[in-house]
Amino acid sequence: MTSIFQLTLFALILFSFVLVVGVPVVFALPNGWTENKRIVLSGLGLWILLVFVVGILNSFVV
């Protein structure tokens, strides 16, 4: 269970870094938001899901 938690936490950290870099790039493009709105919102949804999964797995590890 600990390894699953660690992999999920690593995925959350990696995906957070991708969003921190990617979202400002999307907003900086001339038509970035209108063209990539679905990708940004999907990424946000996946990030929220990862936060909840890490929280649930944390209760089993500790």
Curated annotation (Swiss-Prot):
It is a multi-pass membrane protein. GO terms for biological process: photosynthesis; photosystem II stabilization. Keywords: Chloroplast, Membrane, Photosynthesis, Photosystem II, Plastid, Reaction center, Thylakoid, Transmembrane, Transmembrane helix. Its main location: plastid. Belongs to the PsbZ family. PSII is composed of 1 copy each of membrane proteins PsbA, PsbB, PsbC, PsbD, PsbE, PsbF, PsbH, PsbI, PsbJ, PsbK, PsbL, PsbM, PsbT, PsbY, PsbZ, Psb30/Ycf12, at least 3 peripheral proteins of the oxygen-evolving complex and a large number of cofactors. It forms dimeric complexes. This is Photosystem II reaction center protein Z. It comes from Stigeoclonium helveticum.
